Amino acid sequence: MNIIIDPKVSGEELRRQLYAGNLIILTHLRALENFVDYTREQLIDLFRPYEPEHVHEHIDPAEMARILGGWKPRFIHSDTSKKLVREIIQEAGFPAEQTHYDLPKPRTSFPQGHLTTGVAFAFPWHRDTWYSAPAQQINWWLPIFPVREDNAMSFDPASFARAVPNSSGAFDYYRNNASRLTTAQQVTREQQARPAALSHQPEQQLVIIPAPGQILLFSGTQLHVSIPNTSGLARYSVDFRTVDVPDLLSGRAAPLVDVQCTGTAIRDFLNVADGSAFDEELVTKLYGAPPSDAMLVFEAPNA
């Protein structure tokens, strides 16, 4: 695994590097700075008069779940959020017509002892592909406030193309969509199926700490984990994902070595240029026909 900063290459070469297991950090995108400013202002307004990084000292977990459960869907489905994400993707060199993206997800990581379930779930060792992500998925992760090695996330470079025992066989994307309707109510106990590595103890871990205004790109095959937050500060980040259409059609992708889940998240991805979803006939050809009663795409109440 290599860590590549601001590579001067095409979007196609960026994807090739990511499919090979490398990590890429982009540091000079004006659209990214605009997105960070926009998100930070929302968090400051949401928690006023408290500082977002210290808000857990003043608000209990149940009230925090209520506040975030109301704000996160508004942020995710905001036209401004989507517009800013599209601008980031295009400024990074990914052609709009052949790139699909999913909606930006704000993540919150509170210090241990506070809210770590539901809307603030702390992810164990996992690959996004265990959550029915396509093999062509590229993750884009950016902090909103400064992060540290004791509240960020960690990678296991040695396991990128090596099978790891995991629980992804119990995960079905369509059933998970239905269970997400109660995510904001999960305050003390996690109720959703969350695929994870089983008793995973990597020999080495790699922690990447981009600054606000920088963004980390990595393949959905990368094995990574939310570091238990012992910093005393709340961590706020946003992530979204992209899929390249020619890569999807040709099968060019990162390796799938241990994926056992069912269903597919591909319908969540919208074209950067015109907002269209993948054609259902194509999805069925690539991934098979879904059950007749499946919730193919999650729809948040009042989104």
Model-identified regions with their sequence ranges:
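Short secondary-structure capping micro-motifs at structural edges
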Residues: 125-129, 202-206, 225
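Double-stranded beta-helix
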Residues: 150, 154-219
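Short, solvent-exposed loop/turn segments at secondary-structure junctions
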Residues: 31-32, 113, 130, 146-148, ...
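Residue-level detector of short, conserved catalytic/binding motifs and their immediate flanks
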Residues: 138, 214, 236
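Conserved double-stranded beta-helix
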Residues: 90-154
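Glycine-rich, often proline-containing surface loops adjacent to acidic residues and nearby aromatics
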Residues: 19-23, 59-72, 99-104, 136-138, ...
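Non-heme Fe(II)/2-oxoglutarate
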Residues: 222-303
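N-terminal auxiliary "cap/dimerization" subdomain that precedes the catalytic jelly-roll/cupin core
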Residues: 1-92, 211, 283-303
